[in-house]
Curated annotation (Swiss-Prot):
Necessary for the splicing of pre-mRNA. Residues 214-297, 334-412, 453-539 form the RRM domain. Residues 83-93, 121-149 have a biased composition (Basic residues). SUPFAM superfamilies: RNA-binding domain, RBD. The gene is U2AF65B. This is Splicing factor U2af large subunit B. Residues 1-82, 94-120 have a biased composition (Basic and acidic residues). The keyword Repeat applies. Keywords: mRNA processing, mRNA splicing, Nucleus, Repeat, RNA-binding. GO terms for cellular component: commitment complex; nuclear speck; U2-type prespliceosome; U2AF complex. Belongs to the splicing factor SR family.
Length: 548
């Protein structure tokens, strides 16, 4: 049975022997191993691929991270650039704002400067300013606000009107001696004052006063003159005429020259030598005759105590071509200096004042060489030398407008008038003549007010400036009454003289308006220049006579 079962098993197994079975199994396992190896290789390949892919992914991630970093850097740079741009824009805007503020301030400053320059052109009377400044001022806008400066009047009228103060002349009851027939105390409208102009207040002698007594004025110098040439010339001339009385050496210590005005101040080493130099008036210097005078600050009272005030009679003037007694015309012991004259006084008015004491032998109202305007002082000599001291005593110290007259002998200390000169008749004549002068210079009320020394000829030449001044005058003058007419004479383009240039005439409907205007305007400043307001004769104004 067992054998049968074994045989059956062998049949089941294919009827092959056992050894054959093992060989067959080995043959089948090899391909399987190869397949497994191949699978393993594939797995390894897949792992490598995965690793490679993961590596690539990591590289890509790194690249992406780098890109993100770069993007962040770019964003950061863009933010910085944007911030920088905004900051720069903000700074530019702030700079523009500051610049605009600066421009506005500068514009306001420029406007103030233009207003100030407009005042300056009326205040500064040197006449040497360039026309280019005038062009700049004229280019300002005509539409500027009037609230800044209503008119050229730069100050309000004072609480008490500054009106011209005329001399207080004594009444006949104050004169020594008996009363004058026909003279009454109420004859003059002027106040009563003490008549004592002869009192001279003593002053301490100073070195400055000594220096002034040693200086002489030399005018009319040629353009080629300089300090050295003037000093050498006067040293030689003083030695030639025997004027070096202080001993050997040069008489001239110092020379100051004003080249624009062509004059010099020559300082001598002694008062006596300065007095000797006065004899050289009219001498030729480099072919031109020169004037030799005392300076305006010369004080004869102090100088008289320092030494001779007149040239020595022993000078040899013929040695330098001069004739004794001929120099100067107005020179001499009776020559009178009249200082403190109001600038608006004409030559005729000054003559009228001086001739109230008698006819004049010589008269010279000193004027500016460039403008022709009065400098406020004059010299005169009377035909009758006996009235010299009377005139000095009567006129010295009196008020004329806003000025006080200084009247004295020009070349020596003040002398006391002789008793026979102090006649009551002459003093009465003085009262009458001064009263007449007061009415002449504008004390009698009229409908016309004249403002003097208000504008210059240069300002009136330009049409726009002229209209500005005219507008200012209308605005201001119209405040005080019914203003009928404003007249401002202008220079002639051809250079011909025109009467009244520098004056402003205001015509009112009645005397009351003119009086208010005169009271309010007198003493104020127009363009920095003091205004002098006087009444003007209506008949002369209506006939266009503007030089009265």
């Amino acid at each position: 049975m067992a054998d049968d079962h074994a045989a059956a098993a062998d049949l089941v197994d294919g009827g092959r022997p056992e050894g054959d079975t093992h060989s067959r199994e080995d043959g089948l396992s090899k391909p399987r191993d190869k397949d497994r190896e191949r699978e393993k290789d594939k797995d390894r390949e897949r792992h490598r691929d995965r690793d490679r892919d993961r590596g690539r992914d990591r590289d890509r991630d790194k690249d992406k991270e780098k890109d993100r970093d770069k993007e962040r850097d770019r964003d950061r740079d863009r933010d910085k650039d944007r911030d920088r741009h905004h900051r720069h824009h903000r700074e530019r805007r702030e700079h523009r704002d500051r610049s605009d503020d600066h421009d506005r301030h500068r514009s306001r400053d420029s406007e103030r400067r233009r207003d100030h320059e407009r005042d300056g052109r009326r205040r500064h009377r040197s006449r040497s300013r360039s026309r280019s400044r005038g062009r700049d001022r004229r280019s300002r806008s005509r539409s500027r606000s009037k609230s800044k400066r209503v008119s050229g009047f730069d100050m309000a009228p004072p609480a008490q009107a500054v009106v011209p103060q005329f001399p207080a002349i004594p009444t006949p009851s104050q004169f020594p001696g008996t009363a004058i027939p026909g003279m009454f105390p109420n004859m003059l409208p002027m106040g009563v004052g003490q008549f004592n102009p002869l009192v001279i207040q003593p002053q301490a002698m100073t070195q400055q006063a000594t220096r002034h007594a040693r200086r002489v004025y030399v005018g009319g110098l040629p353009p080629t003159a300089n300090e050295q040439s003037v000093a050498i010339y006067f040293n030689q001339v003083m030695a030639a005429i025997g004027g070096n009385t202080a001993g050997p050496g040069d008489a001239v210590l110092n020379v100051y020259i004003n080249h624009d005005k062509k004059f010099a101040f020559v300082e001598m080493r002694s008062v006596e030598e300065a007095s000797n130099a006065m004899a050289l008036d009219g001498i030729l210097f480099e072919g031109a005759p020169v004037k030799v005078r005392r300076p305006t600050d010369y004080n004869p009272s102090l100088a008289a105590a320092l030494g001779p005030s007149q040239p020595s009679p022993n000078l040899n003037l013929a040695a330098v071509g001069l004739t004794p007694g001929s120099a100067g015309g107005l020179e001499g012991p009776d020559r009178i200096f009249v200082g403190g004259l109001p600038y608006y006084f004409t030559e005729a008015q000054v003559r009228e004042l001086l001739e109230s004491f008698g006819p004049l032998r010589g008269f010279d109202l000193v004027k500016d060489r460039e403008t022709g305007n009065s400098k406020g002082y004059a010299f005169c000599v009377y035909q009758d030398l006996n009235v010299t001291d009377i005139a000095c005593a009567a006129l010295n110290g009196i008020k004329m407008g806003d000025k006080t007259l200084t009247v004295r002998r020009a070349n020596q200390g003040a002398a006391q008038p002789r008793p026979e000169q102090e006649s009551i008749l002459l003093q009465a004549q003085q009262q009458v003549q001064l009263q007449k002068l007061v009415y002449q210079v504008g004390a009698l009320p009229t409908k016309v007010v004249c403002l003097t020394q208000v504008v210059s000829a240069d300002e009136l030449k330009d049409d726009e400036e002229y209209e500005d001044i005219m507008e200012d005058m209308r605005l201001e003058a119209g405040k005080y009454g019914n203003l009928i007419k404003v007249v401002i004479p202008r220079p002639d383009p051809s250079g011909l003289p025109v009467a009244g240039v520098g004056k402003v005439f205001l015509e009112y409907a009645d005397v009351d308006g003119a009086t208010k205007a005169k009271t309010a305007m007198h003493g104020r400043k127009f363009g920095g220049n003091p205004v002098v307001a006087v009444f003007y004769p209506e008949n002369k104004f209506s006939s266009a006579e503007y030089d009265a």
